């Protein structure tokens, strides 16, 4: 079954934990967004893992260099997953993968900025990434003509474990499920909802 990941793009640890508390019954993976980590530091990861020891905690570092070092930092802080940019060099990804093996954790490669996402997805899985996040960032989503259907189609063609992030909501969740994605990543559809718990519950039920 496709897992549900909440991407928390808030700026304060206490706000992130408060949101996670509301949605935790329906979420498999809790993602600390890049702005949150930059705002609050590694302590946000440690606090989230302490609050939810039975959930997977995903640190969206978007690492572009020093893969082994940054992965070690994330894992020692309590993260179960770290993101490395797919647009970076293979050696950076491989370094993070080596660190992940030591800690029994996972590397996720983020395809922001990658032109041929399907090709790169296959390459980085071969390097040892656990899965690949087919990701349209907030800026790309705001561009005229953007459609999550592009990511859904790519997931169907990839033939490797992928997640989809970039406009996952109740309108697109069925397509995400049918694509074969291992994880559906919802951000604003949950944290921007009037009732985040109800929004998360509806998405989780749609994936069942």
Predicted regions and their residues:
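Alpha-helix-loop-beta-strand connector modules within alpha/beta enzyme cores
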Residues: 38, 42-61, 95-113, 145-170, ...
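Hydrophobic, well-structured mid-protein blocks that either form specific transmembrane helices
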Residues: 70-120
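Catalytic cores of alpha/beta
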Residues: 19, 65-77, 115-127, 158, ...
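Hydrophobic faces of well-ordered beta-strands that scaffold small-molecule active sites
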Residues: 4-8, 30-32, 57-61, 82-84, ...
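Conserved N-terminal beta1-alpha1 strand-loop-helix module at the mouth
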Residues: 1-69, 75-76, 117, 123-127, ...
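Glycine-enriched alpha-helix->loop->beta-strand junction motifs that scaffold or abut catalytic
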Residues: 24-28, 51-54, 76-81, 101-106, ...
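Glycine/Thr-rich beta-alpha phosphate-binding loop at enzyme active sites
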Residues: 120-152, 199
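Glycine-rich phosphate-binding active-site loops on the catalytic face of alpha/beta enzymes
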Residues: 79-91, 132-142, 179-203
């Amino acid at each position: 079954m496709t897992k549900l990941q909440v991407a928390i793009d808030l700026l304060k640890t206490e706000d992130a934990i408060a949101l996670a508390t509301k949605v935790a019954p329906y979420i498999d993976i809790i993602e600390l967004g890049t702005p949150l980590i930059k705002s609050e530091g590694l302590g946000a990861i440690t606090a989230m893992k302490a609050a939810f020891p039975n959930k997977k905690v995903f640190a969206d570092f978007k690492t572009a260099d020093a893969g082994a070092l940054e992965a070690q930092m994330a894992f020692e802080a309590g993260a179960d997953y770290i993101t490395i940019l797919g647009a970076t060099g293979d050696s950076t990804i491989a370094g993070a993968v080596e660190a992940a093996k030591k800690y029994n954790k996972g590397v996720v490669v983020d395809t922001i900025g990658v032109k041929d996402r399907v090709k790169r997805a296959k390459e980085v899985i071969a390097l040892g990434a656990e899965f690949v996040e087919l990701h349209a960032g907030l800026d790309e989503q705001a561009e005229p003509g953007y459609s999550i259907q592009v990511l859904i189609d790519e997931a169907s063609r990839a033939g490797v474990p992928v997640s989809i992030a970039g406009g996952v909501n109740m309108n697109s969740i069925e397509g995400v499920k049918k694509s074969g994605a291992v994880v559906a990543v919802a951000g604003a559809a949950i944290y921007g909802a009037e009732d985040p718990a109800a929004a998360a519950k509806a998405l989780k039920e749609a994936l069942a």
